[in-house]
């Protein structure tokens, strides 16, 4: 063998130690199962070693070392396979890296260790691969080669013959690089090896103590003759949760991973989380971000509430009306500056002192002074800018049949429709602010809102509900205050007081309260909610919230808070997956809803429905695996489901059961508690008048959208910004009001939420993803949205009118998102 070694130009003894540490973000090639990855390391296609198998993971951690004989021209190839599929045609290939040794390390005894992170590459089969591989190269072989062994781990059985040298290296006669590397490759030593460096994106969030213990690499070991030796300190070490590859985190910050392996940062000082690594100016940055979020939150509104940019608030209107009514009662005078009554009119007073007006021309009476002008705002149609117009009430004529005009106790006029038993602030004689040119959904949503808020169950009761909280402990204080009060008390006028702050709540304090509380309640820090796979700001219930033994009480409290915000016409700064809104409305979830939960899984299920799966293409049963805190259990989707195979005949039932389990069944207890609290304030029959997209707007409000910012951060495929159809598109968007823009944003991205820093921070299912308009489809087709990628497929319409018609119809009529 030594002669062959000299001919190959390789040393007689191993001179390089390769530590295969981990892989991150492997591709999930199987539809319903995670792979069992293992790695195969090869030098020039001759010396081959194999790691243990990591079970059911896309982020395997091996930390195994192997010694090789190399020179500067040697090529190190490390391939990753799925052990479940190793005997199949593609061998479960998950990626490969190729490294020329001389390019990365000097082959001298005192050379520094090299920690490498390389992207996995495709093979000749051109199969899709994802992820990175982390390895360490060292020329110091003075310490025994110790490979980590665990009882649950196993090595894959590779079928080709091999010859093992005494040091465990496998020599193969063929020098060709094979995608099917063949070895058993058991290393000579089997003592546990201290953990090497593990990158931030692979660190476990639940094993801090283990990581701390593993970081100690200077333990004393013994040689074969019993002489104690002190191994050299390894230059690379296990990163603690309080640092990452860029160094130490600021005081009070911790690095964690979510259920999808995405790294995020926890600020224990403020009990907040962030996707961005904190900097030295983190505190000022956090304050600036929160202030921007607060401003954005306070600018949200609903159609019924918007009567002009500078319109007074409801409290201001009531205060002015009350003052005017008081002046009329005490002085008997009319409104200042109104002049003489029109011919044929007379002002009289009721026994209580309230003025009313008699029109002798028509022999009718009214509470409204005919000299006053009624201001209305026209939406849509020929008045897109919402210009305020004036029209004398005296020229409107009598009310329609079945209608009655009344006054509130603050002298505000409203109208009763006895035909439908509803009330409205809008005078039915005035031109409707929702004329026939306005989309049907807008007319419906506003009328639904009027109906919803006019019902007896939604009226604020007499009295006051006092809630006192500390800003620094708003979650705990609000939980105690809201939980102790009855639903009846919570329906009284809300009076919020912040500890140590003097102020009267005329709406501003309660808006601030719901803003701050929503940031705390839905913070993943508390493990009650988690970010969806769709992006990093839409929320879903955390199926593992049971780690908190009081989690059901908290979910009932959160349900109360959401109901409280709707009841008192306040907004929460939180947005959920579409399926969550459908669950509140009692609607069944469908496969389309899975896209907002897990886009890859949605595509897998859709592929199953669209293709023939006979012949064992998919090895699945009516069961699924569920991992809770490291323990994997098998859950049946139906009785004895683990013994029922999925076929072409029953695959539709399987998909329905799988969707229901992924979205509903896993969080059934939590959602039941949420609904219990929610329905204490909001009756189910009333909330059911809305659909899921309207419910999102009802809870979160409608934001003012900066079209210039939207346009600035838009990409084009097949179009340029100067193309006529693109000009038509932005012209149409600018002509729409805030609600229509929010609907378009919902249609194209899946949510009406705008990132705090604007459209430049828009997220997709795979990270930051700018809004994109792509040229696709025939001009007779409607535009199509891909919500996971924030993409709009826009046909090249010839005229502005055609684009407006098609885009409006697509936004109005589409019931689900991402119809691909």
From Swiss-Prot:
Which Pfam families does the entry mention?
C2, HECT, WW
Q: Does the keyword Repeat apply?
A: yes
Keyword Ribonucleoprotein part of the UniProt annotation: no
EC main class here is transferase
Q: Which GO terms describe its cellular component?
A: cytoplasm
Q: This protein's superkingdom?
A: Eukaryota
Any idea where the WW domain is? 247-280, 339-372, 397-430
- Where is the protein situated, by its record's location annotation? Cytoplasm
Which spans does this entry mark as compositional bias, Polar residues? 140-189, 271-289
Active-site residues are: 788
Residues forming the HECT domain are 486-820
Q: State the EC number(s).
A: 2.3.2.26
Domain C2, chain residue ranges per copy: 1-118
Pathway involvement of the protein, from the record: Protein modification; protein ubiquitination
Task: Give the UniProt keywords, A-Z.
Answer: Cytoplasm, Repeat, Transferase, Ubl conjugation pathway
Which reactions is this enzyme annotated as catalysing?
Answer: S-ubiquitinyl-[E2 ubiquitin-conjugating enzyme]-L-cysteine + [acceptor protein]-L-lysine = [E2 ubiquitin-conjugating enzyme]-L-cysteine + N(6)-ubiquitinyl-[acceptor protein]-L-lysine
Q: What does this protein do?
A: E3 ubiquitin-protein ligase which accepts ubiquitin from an E2 ubiquitin-conjugating enzyme in the form of a thioester and then directly transfers the ubiquitin to targeted substrates.
> Tell me, how does this one assemble?
Interacts with creD.
Q: What is this protein called?
A: E3 ubiquitin-protein ligase RSP5
Species whose genome carries this gene: Chaetomium thermophilum (strain DSM 1495 / CBS 144.50 / IMI 039719) (Thermochaetoides thermophila)
